[in-house]
Amino acid sequence: MIRRIAAVLTVLLLLPLSAAHATVGGWSTPIRLYAASDLQGRGYAYAPSAVAGSPTRLYTCHSRAANTIRDDIFLTKVGGTSTSVLTGTGSGWDHFHNCDPSVVRVNVPFNGHTYSYAMFYLGNDVDASAHNAIGVAVADNLDGPWLKLPNPVIRFPGSSTSEWGAGQPTATTINADQGTVVLAWTQGLPSGNIGKAAQVSFGSGPPIVQFERVLPMVGEDNGLNNFDLVYSPPRDRFYMVREGHPYPSGSQPDYISDHLQIASISGAGFWGTPGVGWTVESTITSARTGTPRTHNPGFLRTIYGTLPNESELTVVYTSAGYDPDSLWSYTLWQTTAPLS
């Protein structure tokens, strides 16, 4: 299984901007959305790309089959069906694990046809959390079918196949008609884990990656892991949800968090204005979730990566129990806080 190390999502939209900063209120009682055990008896689902609509769609990193640690990407329609929509096959660069989806609306020309949606995903070719790269699949609608482009859009950056590499992509539309998105991802190497971002353009066919940069850290932390962003156009502000640190000690698992942190930053600060950093807005703890581990979160977003409702934030997170069966207890929940 590919364990998420760090993820960053960003957005660049040509919309009216404001420096307004909203306050995040208290979090609602969590609502259970889905667990792989609902379908497989003994499975896992986490790292949601949550798309608002009727129904809400959850694209997740999901066990391929019961009692199997091999990642496919599933689509769950909340209150309805759950099916595998992307899987590793054959002998290519992504034939083993397919994980950590991020779905956005953007035009992508491929093989003589222009598709309307892109799914960025982590793929690898080993039965390990290593040698990861980022690919993209395309579809005419949110339900698929999804067709993989042949090559990674972000290639493995390491020098040894035992290194983690590049993964946990998150993307937001810049201009859907022109085929441009901002793609952000984790680079995990022996030197450390960093968030990176770039513009990806599909306008001329094969993806072109430009303006690559390292993303700012949060506070005094040495890394950004397991987080997602959503953009508020009227405020010109990014809201982030991430796994809190330090990770728990004295009990297992110790590689996922027991709380989430919400922070925000202005658009200018996100894109590198000196002296502008993240503001911590809120925390979601086990006192709210009621479970030993609270991890791998995402925001409920529009197909463009913006807030569906400018007056609230909705987080979709993964809960878990203690080992030895923590993995098989993964469950997706939703909680909402007012934004004023």
Where are these regions (language model features)?
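Secretory targeting and sorting signals
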Residues: 1-22
